[in-house]
Every structure is written in structure tokens, then in C-alpha cells.
């Protein structure tokens, strides 16, 4: 019997065997309700109208941009207006043939990381093609452009001790992640604003390592960076330039080298990031730059070192795509014509297209719930697949449809899209005048 104090509870007094048969005191547990935490998080995005629902589709070889939609009611034909296979190269016979031949020759996977048996001859050929494309000494292939941006920017900051990154305010999430993971200093300059950029550069010591990180084509607004002016500032203030050309490679320039090639300033850019998954229609990402930079990233970047390399068939398909687009300008010319035509037709229909000089066609909605409603009705009623673009991909209040015309979209496809959008805009509570004012 306990004397001179409070009585112990059953939990405090009970003893149970420990790991080695010795008793230990039982303590009261207040477990975290993990399921509730996750369900609450999901409820928040549901309530904001930005819960993402994936459309289950199957692309049909030779029929792009047509696809088959799978849902509980069966399989139905759809026209895809939101693919990032911008030129349709994912369906090109040369790409498919190269991939089939690689699989038949060497099998499916690479068999290892790049350091441990995963550097196949296909990877070596691919990096040589990319270095040639950008007229650089070297290139380095990653499993995705997100990984390439993330691990390269983080590694640059770790290698350049005391460095600071100057980042455009509209940079992609992969660049933001890399800058954050680098753990160094950063400053953000106003979008495409060289006056603001110079003000920030001028405030830094000349001897301090500096990296200017920016994109050529910004994927949500379609704006294009003043690359020449930014490179001139980099030279003036002793900074490295890191340019993301993900939404430009394959699609701009005489050989598909991107906006920097188109503008004649590729040689002024220190590091170019690109993708193999958009203009080239396959998968993967890369950087291209000097031999020393690429070798340093190869040797230090965890996102490159500690992962299995791309499948040989993917590398083979990418090589075929790059080689084709280096000599063929037909896809690029048709792509630009289709983008101009779609913008003109949407504007003529009174729809609030965000004007820009690139192939991106954003149509402003400004409300996440309405944006989702419009895209659902496009898909269910008209067989037109457009994915809604909501926060955090774009700022709240700027929710939009992001249309991506390809060389393979026909005038008839545009007729159906414009007619459907006009009808839905009249039906949904979207004020065109308000949205025009918001541009």
C-alpha cells in the first residue's frame, strides 16, 4: 500500500516485459491521428477547388492528338489539348524505330547507376548530341529535368562557397527546390526585369560568386526572357548564367537549340538546362556547359549519382529525336503557325487569352472551381481534354486553361475547341470583361 502520497494509476503501476524479458513501466500514449492529418490536408484543397483528378487516357500510335479516355462508363475518344509533347515527336517513326531497335538489342533497363554499369553507349551518344546541340563542351543526362534543375542548382551552391543565386520570380518549382536545397543565399528579381536584376547585382561585392537562374520560355504565361540583356549583366558583374530551356528546346532555333540559339546568344550562357520529354517527345532531362562544370556536377550531385540511369531505349529515342529536329524545321514552323492561329481564333471569339510571344496559349479563368467545372464539361460533353491550372502552379486568382497546340492539331480540331469554349463561357459565371481587365 502506498503511503504519504497519491495513488498510482493502473498505467503507471503496471509493468510489462521489455525487449530482453525485463519489466519496464507502461506509459500512457497519445498517438498522432495520421489518417486525420492527411484527410484534413486533402479536405483543404477540395474546399479550395484545386484537388487534382487524373484523366485516364491511352494515346494511340499514329493518331496524336487523339486518345482514348477510360472511365466507369467505358472508353471514349478524346482530343488532347494539354500535352507537352509539343511537336508530336513521341509518335515520330524515327523515334519509335530507334527505341524498338534498342530494346531488341540490349533489353529494357540500363542495369545500374551511371557509375556502376549504367553508362551504356546510348547514354554516351545522347550526351554528345546534346553538347553539339548547344555548342558546349559537354552535357550530362538526368532522369528528369526537375532532377537536373534541383540537384544542379543545389550542388552549384555547395561547390561555390559563399555564393548567392539571383532567381527570377517566376522560376519553375524545380529551380526553387534546388535553390532551397543548396542552403545558400538567394535573392529574387522581378520577372524579366533587367533593371531590378542590375540593381541587385550592383549591391553585391564583385568578388562574391553569383549565379543568375532564369528560364527562356515561362510555361504558364508564355513570356520569353531577355537572354542577351541578362547575359550582358552577368558579364558586367562577374556572374554565372543558368538558363532553363525546358519549354524551348526542339521548338526554337535553326536546329532546335532553344531561344538562346534563336537569339544567337548560346555561347554567352554558362549552363543550359533542358528536357527530353517535351519538344523531343521522350523522357529525361539534362544540363549542358563547360567540361569542368559538367564534370563537377557529375562528381558531386546526388541526384545524378544515386539513381539508376535512363533506360537505353529512352536514350536511343531521344538521340533519334534530337538528330531529326537538328535538320528538320517543318515541325517547328507548323507548331508556331498552329499557335498563332489558335490565339487569333480564341481572341476573335472573345475569350480572354493572355497574350505572349511564345507557343503557350493561356486562357484566363480566375477562379479554381469554375476552372475545374469548365474543363470537366469540355471532357464530358465535348471529348476535349484540357487540364485546369490552379494554385500553386499559378497564383490564386489567375487560374487558367493552358492550351498547347501541336503541329498535328487540325483546323477542324480548332473549330470544335473554339465552339465548345464559347458555349461554356456563356454558360459558366465568368465575366469576360472582368477577366480582360485582370490580364
Question: Which residues are covered by each model-predicted region?
Answer:
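Active-site C-terminal subdomain of aminotransferase-like
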Residues: 237-240, 247, 252-357, 370
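Conserved PLP-anchoring active-site segment centered on the Schiff-base-forming lysine
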Residues: 152-173
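Conserved N-terminal alpha-helix of the aminotransferase class I/II PLP-enzyme fold
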Residues: 96-144
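Conserved PLP-binding catalytic core of the aspartate aminotransferase-like
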Residues: 332-342, 347-383, 391, 397-398, ...
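N-terminal "arm"/small-domain region of PLP-dependent enzymes with the aminotransferase-like
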Residues: 31-106, 239
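Active-site phosphate-binding strand-loop segment of PLP-dependent enzymes
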Residues: 85, 187, 191-243
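Substrate-binding/gating loop at the entrance of the active-site cleft, primarily
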Residues: 144, 166-182
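PLP-dependent enzyme catalytic core of the Aspartate aminotransferase-like
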Residues: 7, 22, 86-89, 93, ...
